[in-house]
Amino acid sequence: MFKLGVLLTICLLLFSLNAVPLDGDQPADQPAERLLDDISFENNPFYDPAKRCCRTCFGCTPCCG
């Protein structure tokens, strides 16, 4: 009986982990799309590349962060 319980426990653990669907919206699942979504401060419309700072401090990390 003990061997049957151990075997049943192992099978339930293995197959239950495989049956759980992965969430496709996670960034780790979509590395190519993560590279396309560049939201860095250089793309901020208020960023001044000459000063390497923002004209306004709202939402720009080099000056205000």
UniProtKB/Swiss-Prot annotation:
Leader sequence residues: 1-19
Residues carrying 4-hydroxyproline: P62
Disulfide bonds: C53-C64, C54-C60, C57-C63
Compartment annotation: Secreted
Pfam families: Conotoxin
Source organism superkingdom: Eukaryota
Modified residues (Cysteine amide): C64
Propiece residues: 20-50
Keyword annotations from UniProtKB, A to Z: Amidation, Cleavage on pair of basic residues, Disulfide bond, Hydroxylation, Neurotoxin, Secreted, Signal, Toxin
InterPro entries assigned: Conotoxin
Post-translational modification: The hydroxylation at Pro-62 is observed in PubMed:15924437, PubMed:19380747 and PubMed:22709442, and the non-hydroxylation is described in PubMed:22709442.
GO molecular function, one term: toxin activity
Keyword Disulfide bond: yes
Domain remark text: The cysteine framework is III (CC-C-C-CC).
Biological role: Causes scratching in mice.
UniProt family annotation: Belongs to the conotoxin M superfamily.
Protein name per Swiss-Prot or TrEMBL: Conotoxin tx3c
Organism: Conus textile
